[in-house]
A protein has these predicted regions:
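Hydrophobic alpha-helical segments
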Residues: 312, 394, 434-502
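Substrate-recognition/specificity elements adjacent to catalytic centers across diverse enzyme folds
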Residues: 15-276, 281-284
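Targeting-peptide/extracellular-domain and disordered-appendage signature
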Residues: 377-411, 425, 434
Length: 502
């Protein structure tokens, strides 16, 4: 059905209000979007479906090029617009795509996650269809590259290509260092705290192979999209154009390792007796921003704050009852496994003394300026295979906790957005698998709290800090319930602070 969307904007210098009425297919009732003097959308809807439809519509309208780059990163179609240099990225993206049950996945993030995410996608697509009717109005970067935005699916929203805060590269580096100088010397040079982890390499590990590029697909798909002069249409190939377009180079950069900070203070420590929450998550300064501010209002919803532009809901913010923020709480959710390939059948690998078949998926990747590339993706029962050496009959695969349902970064914030009490907020936190975070809470009833989140494998036989052979000795024993991670409620000292800055 076609309903009205009201969009109002305010020019702060003249105090003139502009209004626009639009008929938008896909809404079930009228929606009002008030755009304030800072460009923040305050969305008022009469039901949940329309609320998230409108969030998707408005966010796509504001960040269309950012949305299209995200979509291509998440679907493994960057080479289609930038050429063969991006083929490795697209292969890696497809290798690490979530391939589980999509309904289970969507409903992890909220009891009505499927409805919310599908409504959001419908809103995004509604705006894309609208702008494609007048392509001359597309933002300039589309014209510079000679491309058009394409439609979204829920699979685009739940992409794992960004914000993972993985540590598998460090595990490989530690393994290489141990191979060169031994575990004790590595412990002297690196700072392992507060425990003394086991980092000796299993005798089955081929030390020479560790120095091969065994994580190439993993690193390729997580790198930033970089634009070059040859990517542009000839009429735009000049210095000014490149300077403009390269503002977008940091779209997927994530500088959280620089150190984020947050704190909550109880009312007995403040002049007015209220609880306070403050948060400064350190992210790359980019144009457009890596955050997107919005205010979402509908029955059961009244939340304002910042979130990832391409996902529904609010990641950091407040509702009528409380406020929350986050910093990184690093959690090791990845392990690197070495396999023996069957010398008589390269489609098999040995696990725990038994030959098993690799799962093989064939994909066709479009490539600008060339023929489509047909690739084969291999999977062991642990996960994506990143390296195969059929001369030495060795393969490596990554087991990733974030390929379980619920591994899309920040999306479980949807549950936090409706929390009315500390207990409800803490329950919402138990669904927050990725990334590992220190979630803090302050509410109007005077409570302050902290809950560490992030999916954490239980390892009984190894530290997870070096590559291990797939001989059955180094398996995960389920996941630690998030509620058992560090937490606190109303500590006697009257405040809680978390920080990543030494």
């Amino acid at each position: 059905s076609l309903m009205f969307v009201f969009i109002l904007g305010c020019n702060s210098s003249t105090q003139n209000y502009l209004s626009e009425e639009k008929k938008v297919g896909g809404l079930t009732d009228s929606v009002e979007i008030l755009r304030d003097e800072w460009g923040i959308n305050h969305i008022y809807a009469n039901n949940q479906k329309d609320l998230f439809f409108a969030q998707g519509y408005a966010a796509a309208q504001d960040r269309l090029f950012q949305f299209e780059i995200w979509r291509r990163q998440s679907t493994g179609t960057v080479a289609e617009i930038l050429g063969p240099d991006e083929l490795a990225r697209d292969i890696g993206t497809r290798l690490f795509q979530f391939r589980g049950d999509i309904t289970t996945e969507l409903n992890h993030y909220h009891p009505e996650g499927k409805e919310i995410i599908e409504s959001y996608v419908q809103g995004v697509n509604s705006y894309i269809k609208e702008i494609l009717k007048t392509p001359e109005q597309l933002p300039l970067p589309f014209k510079m590259l000679g491309i058009s935005p394409q439609l979204w699916t829920p699979e685009v929203v739940i992409s794992r290509h960004q914000g993972l805060l993985g540590n598998i590269g460090q595990e490989l580096q530690i393994g290489r260092a141990v191979a060169l100088i031994g575990a004790e010397k590595v412990k002297e040079l690196l700072w392992f705290h507060p425990q003394d982890p086991e980092i000796n390499l299993d005798k089955e590990i081929d030390k020479a192979i560790l120095f091969e590029d065994i994580l190439a697909p993993y690193f390729a798909y997580r790198k930033t999209v970089r634009f070059k002069e040859e990517h542009l249409k000839e009429s735009f190939r000049k210095k000014e154009s490149m300077a403009f377009l390269n503002l977008y180079n940091d779209l997927s950069e994530d500088s959280l390792d620089l150190g984020s900070n947050n704190w909550v203070v109880a009312g007995n420590k403040t002049a007015d007796g209220n609880t306070y929450m403050a948060n400064d998550p350190h992210r790359t300064i980019a144009v457009p921003s890596l955050r997107y501010m919005a205010h979402l209002v509908a029955p059961g919803w009244n939340v304002i704050g910042g979130g990832e532009p391409e996902i529904p809901g609010i990641s950091i913010g407040h509702n009528e009852f409380g406020a929350w923020g986050l910093t990184v709480f690093r959690t090791d959710g990845e392990d690197l496994y070495q396999y023996e390939i069957n010398p008589k059948n390269a489609l098999q690998y040995k696990h725990n003394g038994v030959w098993k078949d690799f799962t093989v998926i064939e994909e066709i990747i479009p490539v600008k300026g060339g023929a489509p590339e047909k690739v084969r993706l291999y999977y062991s029962h642990h996960g994506p295979v990143t390296y195969r050496n059929e001369q030495k009959n060795i393969a490596y695969a990554v087991r990733c906790a974030w390929l379980e349902p619920g591994g899309s970064p920040y999306l479980a914030s949807l549950r936090m957005d409706q929390a009315q009490t500390w207990e409800q907020f803490q329950e919402a936190c138990t669904y927050s698998n990725i990334p590992g975070e220190n979630m803090i809470w302050a509410d109007k009833k005077g409570n302050i709290g902290w809950q560490a989140v992030g999916i954490a494998p239980i390892r009984s036989n190894h530290s997870g800090l070096v590559p291990v052979p797939a001989n059955g000795k180094y398996e995960w024993n389920d996941y630690l319930p998030i509620i058992q991670k560090p937490n606190a409620l109303n500590p006697e000292k009257g405040f809680i602070a978390t920080a990543n800055q030494n």
